Amino acid sequence: MADIKEGVEEGSVKVDMIKEPLTQGDTGVDEVDFAKITLDDAFKYLNCNKHGLSSAEAAARLQQHGPNKLPDSSRNPVLVFLGYMWNPLAWAMEAAAIISIALLDVADFVLIVGLLLINAIISFYEESNADKAIKALTAALAPKAMVVRDGAIVTIDAVNLVPGDVILIRLGNIVPADVKLLEEEGADEGEQEAPMQIDQAALTGESLPAKKFTGDVAFSGSSIKQGERHAVVYATGVNTFFGRAAALISGTNNVSNLQTVMNKMSAICIVTILLWVVVELAVQFGHYSHECVGGREGCPTLLNMLVVLVGGIPIAMPTVLSVTLALGAYKLAREGAIVTRMSAVEEMAGMDVLCSDKTGTLTLNKLSIDKSMVVPVGNMGVDEIMRMGALSANTVTEEPIDMVLWESYPDRETIKRDYKHTKYFPFNPNDKITIATCLEIATGRVFRVLKGSPQVVLAKAWNAAELDATVNQKMVEFANRGFRALGLAMADGDGKDGTKWEMLALLPLFDPPRHDTKETIEHCQNQGIQVKMITGDHLLIGKETAKMLGMGTEMFPSEVMIKARNGDASQLHGYKNFVEMVETCNGFAQVFPEHKFEIVKILQDSNHVVGMTGDGVNDAPALKKADVGVAVADATDAARGAADIVLTEPGLSTIVTAVIGARKIFQRMTTYSKYTIAMTFRICFTFGLITVIYDWYFPTILIVIMAVFNDGAMIALSKDRVVASKTPNSWNITNIFIMGMVYGLYLTLSTWALYQTATKTTFFEDKTPLHSLNDQYSVLQPWCEDEVRAKLGQTIDPYASLCESNSYAKQFDECEGYQKGSGVQVEDVPTLHAQCVTEQRYLRGAMTRSLIYTQVSISGQALVFVVRTAGYSLMERAGTSTYLAFFFAQVGATLFGIFGLGGFEKPRHQLEDCQFCDYSFHEPVDWFDSGIVPESGTESDFTASVIGCGGYVIVAWIWSAIWYVLLDPIKWILFWILNEEGFRDTMSWRESTKRSLDRRSKDDIGDKEFTGPSGMVPANYSNPLGRASMSKPVSAVLDRKSASLVAINRNSMTVSQDPNRALNIGRRSMIGRPSGPVGRTSMPLGRISRTSNTLSTGSKDGQIGRGSKPLNSSSAEIKPDKYDFASTIRE
């Protein structure tokens, strides 16, 4: 590699000579400090010049040096797959598998391992597909770079940059590679150089932007805060300063909020399971004196413990939640909202305040200039003014204002032919102007054209005092009509010998509101989101736009905000304090980026989840600070880098769609969370209680099969059709735990009642044609006496030795030489009656297990339909995938319940060809061909076997349906007590049910219908404006925002100014739709109350109803404001 000659003095910025240029495969990063060598030496070292590379040279270098990106952080797919089996829940399942194989229970071991593998395969497949799809959609967000190729500036993907490329970097760009700045374009020798300001805090820790001049270096990843300059690339990819730093921290790993939530829920489940495991073992080994001598034959108690351990573990939880999030993020990306931080989906679901910029989000950002409204303030005519405007534009950057000025001048070709830009001073947020230095080719005349904020342009004019009144008056007129004002000035010369600026004109820029913004804002408010306009434009422009959009006009300029923050009570405008003012008002105008940051912080301190939109480099701090930073379409690289969500489609509607999508994702995740907690409690308490009280066994194989059917089907929840919550969402583990516990205990009660009814009563035998499953001795004693006589003859003594049976006598050595009919008892040989009781208990218990299995499976998965909605579950249509999952899972469970396992597992102390295992009506048992039964007296090491319960599956379905009916009322009671989703604050359960009935015929994404006033929450006596503010509205606001209500009856009409009385008239008629702090400006004319025969009217532009007189004498015209009239030309 090339070496630098020795002899360079320490601190020198010049290299005497470079032995050889950069060669193939080299970058020179480690050999040369580019900050200390001259530009000429850098060009020699990189083997290039200021005119950049040709396409062929760039392609060759790309092959040699590789792409300008860090190495892919993708992990080995095998390790990713295995990772799905490495978490606390999987560890518990793996422990169960180890116990199974240690006890030589191969079948359970295989099924448990199979369940783990199925879960991992589904997770790997679904998440991989979602990740690939998201990467494909985010390819459009790949950083771009403006590079000089073949002598022309072209835009390419930054990944294709190579050492030696000359690029153009400007305000808002993220520096795409390590570069060395070239001299300013068009700069003359001796002219003072304007520095670039580059924010490299993320790389170097500098708190303030660094000033950079010609020859200085800028690192990849830093952002341009001011200026525009060409630069030569000297390092790309891993060889950049950022690349080497990233390599050092690549091992760090942050725990997401979802992972934290899963850890908490996993802990709840595991603690519950372990408690029951301890109780079961203590009772069975203690009270029931079970023994454990090792091996499968000698320790059935441990196998029974696996039922609680395997059944209670929500093994599918990481899969369902992560896949739900991944698939949801993919769907958001398809709808124009690309998630850069996955946990932002959860925060977007909880967002209750959205601070939106005006330009491009609430408006179209398609500027136009009405030439008839141009205001000349000098000696030029309108055509000449428009020509100067076109000359001031830099069309390379394609900024909206530059483009509208350029395109508004019809004779653009003459400008290209007759003039040349020799220098361009770009816009920056501090100066608020641009300056173009122009050369008239024919005459050699040099002049400069300045455009920008009217106040700034006016201040530079030589006759500013004379023009001040005219300019301010016209600015107010423009603002009253919703126009932004742009100042234009010119001066002869290039500025070296002083400048005499002459202001030429004020140009009106109109940016029309989006056609769907008004409806979208209404929808936002109906979804519990307060929209605040945060604009850099003049206050009057903001208010006029707000009126067009139906927003509230309670807006203030940043000057008022600053004074109020500093304790000036006169600027509070009736609010109690500054915090309430920020929280309650509809927006702020004439704001700077630091104001946005402060607004976000104040709202967050008031317990709001705040979303902030932005597009510029100076919006980055506020975007980073916000809970949900949203970079709008066509945002700068810096804004995109700071945002959590990047929009690819313009407009507020995309944000609302993303919020609704995020809430749906959240709804799916909380649905599964409630379900899985409920199932843990249900399995633990159901089988734990029956085992502890009755020393009852349940085969592990059944619980594993149930987990395969039901937990596998839960993946469908990630694609379920849900209705987004009307209120912001957040994880409330306490509520999830309480609701899951109540559901689980209720389902436990349903199974317990079924077990008691089937095994301790004769209800089913008496009321249905089904045989009895009653296992009580009082029932079995007479039945077995009849059964023994029916099988062996009426003269046989039922209590005689088992040796009386030819079949069984062959299986006992003790029966050798036994004389039938002697009635002699044989030691160690059970009696006929005792064997009959044992066989019947074995048979009925085995069939009861199939019944319980089927009922637990059906009622458990049916719970999903209850917890997925706040309304009536039978009327809220679920997704097709959810129905199909339930159908196939329960068809499998039903078939399994009918046919069972034919007596598997076989009893350890067994007799073949059972003699007394008929149904209770003395018919042979179906699906029990083996006839293997346990020997009487071996119950202490009894193996839990399974035989199909046949027609009892109908009982399981009917029983589950009956108990299902009460789940919705229980849910509503819990919603009321816990105020889930604002249930208690916003509606009664009857209203919730009615609303769910209304919704089921609608498309699930829209819910366009208003369900309350236009404010955040429905009005009530303590909150008559329906505000979502944490603080009570001040009296001044109530007085200012109250509207009259006209109550009409046949004989009289009364007008009420009392908000409380308004509430008595009718819920929907309250204050019309108030133009309150968070409401719309007014209500549509003559809206009829739904709850009473009243007509509610609201003011719109100062008018009431059709043709009626105003309530007050205030005019709809906006008066000139006392505040500073400086308006910015971009937000």
Swiss-Prot record:
Gene3D superfamilies: Calcium-transporting ATPase, cytoplasmic domain N (3.40.1110.10), Calcium-transporting ATPase, cytoplasmic transduction domain A (2.70.150.10), Calcium-transporting ATPase, transmembrane domain (1.20.1110.10), HAD superfamily/HAD-like (3.40.50.1000)
Predominant localisation class: membrane
Superkingdom, natural source: Eukaryota
Biological role: The plasma membrane ATPase of plants and fungi is a hydrogen ion pump. The proton gradient it generates drives the active transport of nutrients by H(+)-symport. The resulting external acidification and/or internal alkinization may mediate growth responses.
EC number(s) given by UniProt: 7.1.2.1
Keyword Transmembrane helix: yes
Presence of the UniProt keyword Magnesium in the record: yes
GO biological process: proton export across plasma membrane
Residue ranges crossing the lipid bilayer per the database entry: 77-97, 98-118, 151-171, 231-251, 265-285, 305-325, 642-662, 689-709, 733-753, 884-904, 946-966
Chain spans, region Disordered: 994-1023, 1067-1131
InterPro entries the UniProt entry points to: ATPase_P-typ_cation-transptr_N (IPR004014), ATPase_P-typ_cyto_dom_N (IPR023299), ATPase_P-typ_P_site (IPR018303), ATPase_P-typ_TM_dom_sf (IPR023298), ATPase_P-typ_transduc_dom_A_sf (IPR008250), HAD-like_sf (IPR036412), HAD_sf (IPR023214), P-type_ATPase_IIIA (IPR006534)
Compartment(s) where it occurs, according to its Swiss-Prot or TrEMBL record: Cell membrane
GO cellular component: plasma membrane
Lineage: Eukaryota, Viridiplantae, Chlorophyta, core chlorophytes, Chlorophyceae
Gene Ontology MF annotations: ATP binding; ATP hydrolysis activity; metal ion binding; P-type proton-exporting transporter activity
Annotated active site: 357
Protein name: Plasma membrane ATPase
UniProt-annotated binding residues for Mg(2+): 615, 619
Encoding gene (name): PMA1
Keywords for the protein's UniProt record, in alphabetical order: ATP-binding, Cell membrane, Hydrogen ion transport, Ion transport, Magnesium, Membrane, Metal-binding, Nucleotide-binding, Phosphoprotein, Translocase, Transmembrane, Transmembrane helix, Transport
